[in-house]
Amino acid sequence: MISMAGKAIRRWWALFALPTFAAFIIGFLVPFIMGVYLSFCEFTTVTDGEWMGLKNYTKALKDKEFLHALGFSTAFTIVTTIVINVIAFAIAYMLTKAIKGSTLFRSVFFMPNLIGGIILCYIWLLLLNGVLAHWGRALTYKASYGFWGLVILVCWQQIGYMMIIYIAGLQALPTDVLEAAAVDGANGRQTMFRIIIPLMMPSITVCSFLTVTNGFKLYDQNLALTNGAPSNMSEGLALNITRTFYGRMGWEGVGQAKAVLFFILVAVIALIQNKLTTSKEVAA
């Protein structure tokens, strides 16, 4: 029998869902549809768009700065995804062992994730420039300095968050399986690669998805740490799109086309990555 509260929820659920649904329509769906439409137009405001067909997409794909930003973001995402997940998993594995102070270490490793991105960037800007100053260099002296500076910053910020997810996964592992492996004579390497990692695929799927999408969406750290210097050589996709839209007169449509391409790219890569890791999760 359905309770009175259950009957009330069934009767009025639409009323409670309406504010969230309206916010989704107004805040996401309508701007998204308008953005896709304007990517095919030449415009200065959203009301004066003139249809241009695929011209904006052609200009975007021929823009050398955009292609360089694509390569920069791709390389950055590959490096940070590997580094963050490997280190976060290793730390999580160590902290799930019976070691003294493990709770304190978990808090310490997670703390960088609580600091705002812009503030964190300026802290690391001072630190990295202070080190490079010994050789008469600055973070914006070469694109490679900016690249590795961003890698260090983002890894330091996100490792703690991914560590928490891995710790939750490790603590949920069935102990009877691990005990059976030990009884059968499996060594540490065999236990890790044939039992623990396959069973950890749900956590690996989540963490790899987050690091891949965060890598491509990098903006505030890129803006504050290098601002694309030198000569836009350390500029990621998000920063390039923003500068195209707001900084190049008459290129608003091209900037919008870049944003649509960016959305498609991240969505496709995220779906492929999720499919690959999920298939291993099912097989495990």
Regions found by a protein language model. Give the residues of each.
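Short, intrinsically disordered terminal tails adjacent to the first/last structured region
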Residues: 1-4
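A structural signal for multi-pass alpha-helical bundles of membrane permease subunits
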Residues: 6-284
